[in-house]
Structure formats: structure tokens, C-alpha cells
Design a protein with these regions (language model features):
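ABC transporter nucleotide-binding domain
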Residues: 169-263
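Positions that flank functional sites
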Residues: 111, 129, 255-256, 291
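Hydrophobic/anchoring residues in structured secondary elements
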Residues: 6, 31, 248-251, 288
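Conserved catalytic Walker-motif region of ABC-type ATPase nucleotide-binding domains
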Residues: 1-4
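C-terminal coupling/interaction segments
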Residues: 263-308
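ABC transporter nucleotide-binding domains
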Residues: 6-203, 207-208
Length: 308
């Protein structure tokens, strides 16, 4: 994607964004509601044109080779359009025929996606009788039917129960490296648990990109260590403040133990442990406190608001 923009009248829904997704990569497309995620996906799946910029999917230009792009993409929209009067197998046969699958190849494809999406128990049931979770599975099976190299999934776990969410996450992870996956969502834990890399979009602009650990690292101001040490807060806090690189120490007493939050230029876990051992202090907790993806997301979105 290069310098992609989309206007609706004077409203700028997508603002000059650029990014690349590699073969076999699972990338989360993350942003609050109204950020421009779905508009971008509609452009990449040839549902609507961009105002300016360029994009290729599986080597095909989305503006001049739309049929080739559609053939290379399995797309699952947020609200899966299904025919409620059809049975699941009947619907998949219909969709397979639209994809150019016939005869033995189509039935083999249906069997493959039925098993992969856990639809065996409902394959002959009318879609109107299916729960939200099973309808989502049918939509995912449809996207996988023609075994496309690229999968674009828009909010694939919305409406699913916790067990179904875990199963869907597992399935998406299994799809790599045979498929390139773009997963659009506004649900932070969903993206963090599933994706290798995250692209954050806000008000149409790409505001951050990186792996979950890289994004968390960006918000960390130095290294924060949490420790619980047996003893008086004043004595322990004073000793820790003398350690090299320490910029802040918060100490409080809990049931005879001192709980410390230590911010320093580097990871001081080993130094704190050595200090406690030398002074004869018992330690029952010592770990680095990493910033959460939620912290980063809130900071980046809030920062974008402040810049406006």
C-alpha cells in the first residue's frame, strides 16, 4: 500500500497511508471505531476505489486487476452476508461455484473447510438455525474455500463466546505460513494474541507499526522493576535509590513486606537481587513490569488527539 487516501466528499476517511505485509505474515490492523480500517479493507478487496495512491495484493493492482485480486483474496467482512434459507453445504457449494470450483474439486474444498472450521455437526443445517458463532465459522469457511494466498478478516471474533474465540485464534495462527493474513479489529487482546505485527490507524492516519513487544517497548520510559522485599520501606527504598541509573522509586509497606516500583535506565533485577542478598533481605517477588499494548494504544491515540 502506497500513499493511499480516500475521501467521502470533504471527509478524509483514509489519509495517505503506506504499509507492506509480507508473505505468510499475520498482521493486525488495529484502531478505534471510525479509524478508517474498514474503508482501507474495502479498497484492498476491490469493493470501492481509493481517491489516490496505489495498492497491490498478491502482485495484482487493485485498481486495474480487480478480478485477479478478488481471486487471490479470501475476505470475511464483519457482518457476514449469508442466505438464511440455504443449508450450510448448499451455501458452500454455491460459493464454490462462484469461485470456479466444480465437481470433485469443489466437494474436496468443502470437506477441507468444513473440518478446518469445525462445521461437521451443522453442515446440513439451515443457516437460519445457526448461532452467531457458527455463522462466523461459515463466513470463515467461505473465505478459505478457494484456498487463497491472502486472507482479510474484518472483526472475525465479534459475537463469539470465549471458547470459540480461542478456537478461531488458533485457526488463524495455523493459516500462516501458507496464507498471508490481515486481521482488522478494535479489540486489543485479540490482535496481541494472534498477530506477529500490528499496524495502528487513527482518524485515517497510520500512527504506529511494529510487533507487540516493539510497541510496548516504545512506551516504556526506561526499565520498570517490581519487587517485594522483607523489611522497612524507608531503609529498603533508600538503598535502592543509591543504585546506578535509578530515576524513581516508589515504596509501600504491605504485611511486613516492602513493595517497590523501580524505574531505571536499564534492567536492575540482578542488581536489586544482589543488594538484597548482601543485606540479608528476603525477596519474594522480582520481575520486570512491561507496558501493555493497551497502554501504548491509549498513549498513541491520545497523542494524536493532542496534536490536532
Amino acid at each position: 500500500v502506497r500513499n493511499l487516501s480516500k475521501y467521502y466528499g470533504t471527509h478524509r476517511a483514509v489519509d495517505n497511508i503506506s504499509f507492506t505485509v509480507a508473505d505468510g505474515e499475520i498482521v493486525g490492523f488495529l484502531g478505534p471505531n471510525g479509524a478508517g480500517k474498514t474503508t482501507t479493507i474495502r479498497i484492498l478487496t476491490c469493493f470501492q476505489p481509493a481517491t489516490s495512491g496505489s495498492a497491490t495484493v498478491a502482485g495484482h493492482d487493485v485498481f486495474t486487476e480487480s478480478l485477479a485480486v478478488r481471486a487471490a483474496v479470501g475476505y470475511m467482512p464483519e457482518n457476514v452476508p449469508l442466505y438464511p434459507e440455504m443449508r450450510v453445504r448448499e451455501y458452500l457449494r454455491f460459493r464454490g461455484k462462484l469461485r470456479g470450483l466444480d465437481g470433485t474439486a469443489r466437494e474436496a474444498a468443502i470437506d477441507r473447510v468444513t473440518q478446518r472450521c469445525w462445521l461437521e455437526d451443522v453442515i446440513n443445517r439451515p443457516i437460519s438455525q445457526l448461532s452467531k458463532g457458527f455463522r462466523q465459522r461459515v463466513g470463515l469457511a467461505d473465505a478459505l474455500l478457494h484456498n487463497p494466498p491472502v486472507l482479510i478478516l474484518d472483526e472475525p471474533t465479534v459475537g463469539l463466546d470465549p471458547t470459540q474465540i480461542r478456537e478461531t485464534r488458533s485457526l488463524i495462527r495455523e493459516l500462516a505460513p501458507d496464507h498471508t493474513v490481515i486481521l482488522s479489529s478494535h479489540i486489543l487482546p485479540e490482535v496481541e494474541a494472534t498477530c506477529q505485527r500490528i499496524i495502528i490507524i487513527h482518524k485515517g492516519k497510520l500512527v504506529a507499526s511494529g510487533s507487540p513487544s516493539e510497541l510496548r517497548e516504545r512506551i516504556s520510559e526506561g526499565a520498570k522493576v517490581i519487587a517485594e522485599i522483607k523489611g522497612a520501606p524507608d531503609e529498603i527504598g533508600a538503598a535502592v535509590r543509591q543504585l546506578p541509573g535509578v530515576t524513581d522509586v516508589q515504596a509501600e509497606r504491605r504485611d511486613g513486606w516492602t513493595r517497590l516500583a523501580v524505574v531505571a535506565a536499564s534492567d536492575l533485577r540482578e542488581t536489586i537481587a544482589q543488594t538484597a542478598f548482601t543485606r540479608g533481605w528476603a525477596v519474594r517477588e522480582l520481575h520486570r513490569d512491561a507496558a501493555s499494548l493497551e497502554d501504548f494504544f491509549v498513549k498513541i491515540v491520545t497523542g494524536a488527539h493532542e496534536q490536532e
